[in-house]
Amino acid sequence: MNDYDSSVTLAGQHGRDNGKNFQIREVPPVEMATFILRLLGAIRLEGVDELRALMTPAEGVDEIDTVLRLLAGCDATATRALILDVLKYVMVAPDPQHPGMFRALRDDDIKELRTLGDIIGAFVRTHVMPGI
């Protein structure tokens, strides 16, 4: 990773995802701006202040709790499309013995809902929150 690369690597820690590494690649600014607008519409918030408040979890709150709080009351179809868009920017190193050997994410690579929540949370913190 260089100074201009905002990719983030996250270690899978839950169940069948334990030992896998997930890398969230940098998203181009135009795509990120469009994503943020779609996100605000899908989660039916009045504005970015509400999003910031939802994405600032209380101390000791689990990542999945924050994600589920964020998704409560959302347009399910729009939210699914946003999640699939997020996952286009995720790569996986599925073998713990080769933690740096990343490849494109496949549908069956994420086995645990908590891992999906961690990935979505990391994506929002590193790509969405700095943009708003």
Model-derived regions: residue spans:
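Short, surface-exposed, charged amphipathic helix/loop patches that serve as local interaction elements
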Residues: 28-132
